[in-house]
Design a protein with these regions (language model features):
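Acidic, low-complexity proline/glycine-rich segments
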Residues: 2-6, 88-90
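Generic structural signal for well-ordered, non-membrane alpha-helices
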Residues: 32, 36-39, 95-99, 118-121, ...
């Protein structure tokens, strides 16, 4: 019976470590997808000149948070300031993206391309910091949770 309880505790702690690793991976995925969105939107502004809502509806994202954010922007549901429903991004990052999305279309194409480049540099710096964080802490969280689980089992026995 002690073995089953011990294994359950260790598996539970490992699960927490894997959840932390997954959260860090989702943050990296969000910023990668946002960068891909910016690259494709830059091409759209330069050549296709499709409307923003049409472009967003045709954009397929692997990040659920980016999809939620873009859908809320196009739908403008009952509450524009709704910050719930995002799993890994912070409210400051949501505000940064919203500020960019609301600034789209207020200038001509040349200035719009410059705005996209400025926003892209901000996102690139965030993406680089998130990649460093992921490479530093993802494996560590699983190992640390395993060690913590074993330590709890030892203390319980």
């Amino acid at each position: 019976m002690n073995i089953i309880i011990s294994l359950s505790v260790v598996v539970g702690f490992i699960y927490l470590g894997l959840c932390t690793k997954n959260m860090l991976k989702e943050r990296v995925l969000f910023f990668e997808e946002l960068e891909r969105f910016l690259n494709e939107f830059k091409v759209n502004v330069s050549f296709a000149q499709m409307g923003l809502s049409d472009f967003i509806n045709n954009f397929n994202s692997k990040s659920s948070d980016l999809t939620i954010l873009l859908n809320r922007f196009t739908n403008l549901t009952k509450n524009q300031n709704e910050e719930k429903g995002f799993s890994v991004i912070k409210s400051e990052e949501v505000d940064l993206v919203k500020e960019f999305l609301f600034s789209i279309g207020k200038t001509d194409a040349t200035n719009q391309l410059q705005e996209i480049e400025v926003f892209k540099t901000k996102i690139s710096s965030l993406l680089n910091s998130e990649r460093k964080t992921y490479s530093k802490y993802a494996g560590l969280s699983v190992k640390l949770s395993l060690m913590l689980g074993v330590m709890v089992v030892i203390l319980l026995l």
